[in-house]
């Protein structure tokens, strides 16, 4: 029997459900597993730019060192930059910081943060000049 695996992007959830899930995981690491679909679905499918950016920044600043939520937040900032074509200064600085931390110590922040920062630089035109 051949099994076909399928991939689907998670849907955006109502804001109240997003806030509840993210706050619970930020208070108690045992709930971190619930966050991936919630944050990715929000970053990919929620049309409220301010809400999406706010929660990517919240997760990226409040998650503990070594938490997989840090790399996820960086990745989702990249999705947000791609979708909306803009990020606030705090979000850009956070994406850069998370990527730097991932490069320095992947046990602190996983490599998804570097992918996210690449997207931020690409979609916001922030690549360093090649003088």
Where are these regions (language model features)?
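Amphipathic alpha-helical scaffolding segments comprising HEAT/armadillo-like alpha-solenoid repeats
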Residues: 15-23, 47-60, 83-99, 126-130
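Hydrophobic core positions within HEAT/HEAT-like alpha-solenoid repeats
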Residues: 36-40, 74, 114
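Eukaryotic acidic, Ser/Thr-rich intrinsically disordered low-complexity regions
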Residues: 2-3, 92, 97-131
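Residue-level detector of extended alpha-helical repeat arrays and alpha-solenoid scaffolds
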Residues: 32-36, 70, 110
């Amino acid at each position: 029997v051949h099994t076909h695996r399928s991939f689907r992007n998670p849907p955006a959830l109502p804001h109240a459900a997003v806030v509840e899930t993210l706050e619970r995981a930020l208070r108690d690491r045992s709930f971190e597993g619930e966050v991936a679909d919630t944050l990715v679905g929000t970053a990919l499918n929620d049309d409220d730019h301010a809400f999406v950016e706010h929660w990517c920044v919240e997760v990226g600043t409040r998650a503990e060192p070594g938490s997989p939520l840090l790399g996820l937040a960086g990745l989702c900032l990249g999705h947000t930059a791609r979708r909306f074509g803009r990020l606030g200064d705090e979000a850009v600085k956070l994406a850069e910081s998370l990527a730097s931390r991932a490069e320095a110590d992947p046990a602190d922040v996983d490599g998804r943060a570097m992918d996210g920062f690449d997207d931020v630089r690409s979609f916001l035109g922030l690549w360093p000049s090649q003088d």
